[in-house]
Amino acid sequence: MGQTGKKSEKGPVCWRKRVKSEYMRLRQLKRFRRADEVKSMFSSNRQKILERTEILNQEWKQRRIQPVHILTSVSSLRGTRECSVTSDLDFPTQVIPLKTLNAVASVPIMYSWSPLQQNFMVEDETVLHNIPYMGDEVLDQDGTFIEELIKNYDGKVHGDRECGFINDEIFVELVNALGQYNDDDDDDDGDDPEEREEKQKDLEDHRDDKESRPPRKFPSDKIFEAISSMFPDKGTAEELKEKYKELTEQQLPGALPPECTPNIDGPNAKSVQREQSLHSFHTLFCRRCFKYDCFLHPFHATPNAYKRKNTETALDNKPCGPQCYQHLEGAKEFAAALTAERIKTPPKRPGGRRRGRLPNNSSRPSTPTINVLESKDTDSDREAGTETGGENNDKEEEEKKDETSSSSEANSRCQTPIKMKPNIEPPENVEWSGAEASMFRVLIGTYYDNFCAIARLIGTKTCRQVYEFRVKESSIIAPAPAEDVDTPPRKKKRKHRLWAAHCRKIQLKKDGSSNHVYNYQPCDHPRQPCDSSCPCVIAQNFCEKFCQCSSECQNRFPGCRCKAQCNTKQCPCYLAVRECDPDLCLTCGAADHWDSKNVSCKNCSIQRGSKKHLLLAPSDVAGWGIFIKDPVQKNEFISEYCGEIISQDEADRRGKVYDKYMCSFLFNLNNDFVVDATRKGNKIRFANHSVNPNCYAKVMMVNGDHRIGIFAKRAIQTGEELFFDYRYSQADALKYVGIEREMEIP
């Protein structure tokens, strides 16, 4: 027993030694191969240079060299002096004109930056990409700065790869090399040195043969455990095992990963569920900024399950022609029954969703007898869980049940809502391709019972064929989302009282949380009110239109009902330091046409991008400055301060470097994030600091995002340089900006 315990303790240590030994050997081989490649490329380039040089020499020998004309006098050239070049040899004296260049003042130093027109969220940098050069003076004053800077990044510096760098290629080679060892060799340390040397020679002799052949069996778990212990930042043993499988799988050329769906326009298109067809669109589409793969919101909000209150254009349901499906017996009753079912079906609240991969079973091809996902609303094609249904005695259903990409439940309430009346004419036997069936399932969630519109979009099927295909799949297609039943209108006096109470609540919240502004994340707690457990309430934020709470939520901001310009505290949006929302503020002009230049609402400039023309030129105060081209009035919007959105921790790390440079572009956005315009930004980043500024900065909530607006503090004339208060302390202001601009009479 003692011997067994000793051996079990020695096993992991032995495997760690093997990992280290093989890793160092592979690294050395990689360096040798790299050196050989460099030598080979150097020799090849040198040979090409010699060949090219020889060709040029031959060309120069064949050319006629024309002598240079020698000037004898430059007296005819004004503003020049004569310069003579003499030689002790028999060469004639050469005379050339000498032109004097006047001294020109150098432009201020400018560090490289990338222009942006909107904020760009970036991840924290956990590795120091480069050690900044501060100059000898800074290092002499603070010799420990570089050491402290590296400690802030936990000692991780880009390029420091000693015994810590392992890429996919080395990882696969390392696992294959360790696969040569047997599990019974854990007690190698107990052998004599001569026996260990003989074993090592045998491994080296047969290593080339074993590495050239594919492994006979999957590597032992001990190998991945040992690698994980040596490289803990690369993942656990199970993660390394899965990574090895992915890297070593032999896939056919052009084969798609299991979670991918073939192109619907390609020859390999399959009949799949609506959720699978729209997976990429649902995953990449951001419903806050209406862009695909946006760079501002890392977590995409779940689409709202409630319909908008504005009216929608009704589709034309007249027959499209003499062969329209509506001429069939029972067709109109079938469509009317679908509409009635939609009205009486209660809406289902969705769950939250983040970016992710498809479920493993969703990659299998589906058949026409598969449950399509439940549509949630008409305002957006949302993704929902595809659901297979309950009990079905049909033999064909049982045979194809394993092929479904759906999971559980709602088919018990998604069975055929009505029984189809038998048609006089028999249905056409038309074959549907995978692309057509997939496209039908996508469109049915938007157009529902308008089969004429679906047929026009598909293009290869008539509305009658689409109708018959819909009848065939009626037992497995989920019903359309329920239409909201309008609540009875409140009395006018009660509505005004609620609105006044709401405005007072805005003022109280503004006064109580002026120093605590947190980033907004939409709340998503289905069937629960926004109480003390709601994330919006906890962060002291209003519920926005992106939240999943009810439209009657007491914490939801309803917008304003102003008739004027929304530039005084009489406007609830202006009072709450928000821009008017075009989806909520329908009377002030914020919802006017986007291309309209004359907008009555003056509280929507940031979201519309109504910035002024700015000019960049050297400043009389410090470095570069920004100047206004056209005059602006007091409180008029000038520009948005854009840059990288970074966390507070990342801002602290970057700020220590910026303080040494005595140049910082950090701007607090809220308690969670900071805008850094050092690397990326717009021209307003060059506006200098002043204790008597002509501009002021204001952080505003714009459609759920905090954004920084620069406004005129007074009337500014053409050509004036722009300044705003950086809110430095008195010592920092003298250290960073040593010159204060002269007072200007407004």
Curated annotation (Swiss-Prot):
The modification Phosphoserine is found at S21, S76, S363, S366. GO terms for biological process: heterochromatin formation; methylation; negative regulation of DNA-templated transcription; negative regulation of gene expression, epigenetic; negative regulation of retinoic acid receptor signaling pathway; negative regulation of transcription by RNA polymerase II; positive regulation of epithelial to mesenchymal transition; positive regulation of GTPase activity. Residues 196-222, 374-385 have a biased composition (Basic and acidic residues). InterPro entries: CXC_dom, EZH1/2-like, EZH1/2_MCSS, EZH1/EZH2, EZH2_SET, PRC2_HTH_1, Pre-SET_CXC, SANT/Myb. The gene is EZH2. Its EC number is 2.1.1.356. This is Histone-lysine N-methyltransferase EZH2. Phosphorylated by AKT1. Phosphorylation by AKT1 reduces methyltransferase activity. Phosphorylation at Thr-345 by CDK1 and CDK2 promotes maintenance of H3K27me3 levels at EZH2-target loci, thus leading to epigenetic gene silencing.
